[in-house]
């Protein structure tokens, strides 16, 4: 039986709208955001979609969003190619970009990628820096090839939890109902043992 804590954390849904303007947001699109603001919780800015993500351009777009007074959280994401995005920065350049984005005014949240074989202390330092700037962190992991076994999923969530982000996000590719059930089981078990908000995504139509 699910506890009240599990029901709350597993049923709390946030609606995010994802945008990827090159340098500035058109007035038409800004008007659309205002029009549909009651259906939006988070505005995600995907800067990996840009040919060259420059911090000044990111700051300019965020200022445009902030000036709308929508009272929505602004999430900045640079998704690398290895985790399903278009970003081709080296790991060092990726870390440096996020370090600078964290310092931009009005950034509320940032996505930080987790990879099992990557040196974790760089990620931990980045998360600590974000928290010092009052920026929440979504630590995310994507597997587009498979759904790991239940035990591995639980271990993955636990390792991510140890880095002290605000959200744990795991997205996997299921090929059977059993894969989906394993993700849900890992999600349920993790929700009851960690303080973070926990997210699980099955990237198929199963």
Range-by-range predicted roles:
Residues 3-132, 136-151:
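Active-site beta->alpha loop and helix N-cap motifs at the rims of alpha/beta catalytic domains
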Residues 114-206:
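Catalytic alpha/beta core domains of metabolic enzymes, predominantly
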């Amino acid at each position: 039986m699910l506890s009240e804590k599990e029901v709350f954390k597993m049923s709390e849904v946030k609606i995010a709208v994802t945008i990827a303007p090159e340098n500035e947001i058109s007035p038409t699109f800004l008007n659309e955001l205002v029009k549909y603001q009651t259906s939006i919780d988070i505005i995600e800015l995907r800067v990996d979609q840009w040919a060259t993500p420059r911090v000044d351009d990111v700051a300019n777009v965020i200022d445009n969003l902030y000036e709308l007074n929508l009272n929505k959280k602004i999430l900045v994401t640079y998704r690398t190619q290895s985790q399903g995005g278009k970003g081709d920065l080296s790991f060092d350049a990726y870390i440096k970009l996020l370090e600078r984005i964290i310092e931009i005014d009005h950034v509320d949240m940032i996505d930080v990628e987790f990879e099992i074989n990557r040196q974790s202390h760089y990620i931990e330092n980045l998360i600590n820096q974000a928290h010092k700037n009052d920026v929440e962190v979504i630590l995310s992991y994507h597997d587009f090839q498979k759904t790991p076994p239940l035990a591995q999923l639980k271990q993955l969530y636990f390792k991510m939890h140890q880095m002290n982000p605000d959200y744990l996000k795991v997205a996997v590719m299921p090929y059977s109902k059993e894969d989906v059930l394993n993700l849900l089981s890992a999600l349920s078990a993790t929700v009851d043992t960690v303080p973070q908000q926990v997210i699980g995504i099955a990237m198929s139509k199963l």
